[in-house]
Amino acid sequence: MSETEKIEEAAPPYLCEEPPEGAVKDHPQQQPGMISRVTGGIFSLTRGAVGATIGGVAWIGGKSFEVTKTAVTSVPSIGVGIVKGGVSVVTGSVAAVGSAVSNKVSGKKKDKSD
């Protein structure tokens, strides 16, 4: 018996089976749109979205993803996310969002010669 077969036998049946059809009705699928705010401070931007929220998240780009005030999220495209008090840059597949970045990001400063 191979290791793969041993792992499949060790997994409980409820992990291997498909969820019943009625299980999805409690958590409906999110429909495409510009920006939707969900309770608890979670912001969601969906495909083709360009948008901003006051005191929340501003993001420009494609594919859908969800961001919380401190989250690490998988994003299949390139873009920039901004959180009040912090900045997040999305490059490739991972975005880290949080206020801990705010001390490392500063605005454009003028030279003394200007």
UniProtKB/Swiss-Prot annotation:
GO terms for cellular component: membrane. InterPro entries: UPF0444. It comes from the Eukaryota. It is found in: Membrane. It is a multi-pass membrane protein. Coiled coil: none annotated. The chain crosses the membrane at residues 40-60, 78-98. Residues 1-33 are annotated as: Disordered. Keywords: Membrane, Transmembrane, Transmembrane helix. May play a role in bone development. Belongs to the TMEM263 family. This is Transmembrane protein 263-B.
